[in-house]
Amino acid sequence: MKNRLVIFGLLILLMMSSCIVYHPMPIDIPLISEKNDFRVDAGISIVPSANATVSYGLTDKIAIQGFGSVGADDRYYIQAATGLYKNKGNNKVFELYGGFGYGYGNAYKDANPGNLLGDYQLYFGQANFGKISSSSSNFETGFGLKAGYLHSNLTDKNYYGWTSETGPFKIYHDESILFEPVGFIRFGGNRLRINVKLGGTLIYKFTNKDRNLPYSYLNLGIGLNYRL
């Protein structure tokens, strides 16, 4: 019964993949612990996309990170962040990042039919905490919480309702707040590990509240994580 529920949930996510502008991004939580600590993460997600993250300990306190994702229906997202990290001992690490993201989405509704498409910008902060590998274990786990301001510019090509076959079409400029919790586990070898991430998204719009922003609430990512 539980397996059927899991399969049903995954099928729903796949069916929703063409119906959304935004989805939770499977960005790596690196848990940088020292200067020159370097991680490369690459994988895929249930909401169809391929992604990669690069993270680096620039100094004894400062880390930088870059992320990119490409998906179905011409969706893409790129992000850059910088932040502070602290190795709290006993293999536990705390990170605090701030950054900017830019993306493009295209949602399709076959009831009209119509599309809602355009770009968005995200200004965010994120806190991460977790436990990294030790001499006795290669297992790593942790969680993070991202919060930010989301500005979107989406063109309504008969998505909310039929208006015209050729346009002009209305463009919605919306302001929203975004929350994204994420958890992960990494396991495998000393340097190369399998990385599994489960993330969620909650978006609250301040403008055009009668026009919902189509997005996925959950996303599951899996990939490989390499630490130099």
Where are these regions (language model features)?
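Short glycine/proline- and aromatic-enriched beta-strand/turn motifs that initiate or cap beta-hairpins
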Residues: 19-74
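Hydrophobic, lipid-facing positions within transmembrane beta-strands of outer-membrane proteins
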Residues: 36-38, 46-52, 62, 76-82, ...
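Outer-membrane beta-barrel transmembrane domain signature
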Residues: 109-228
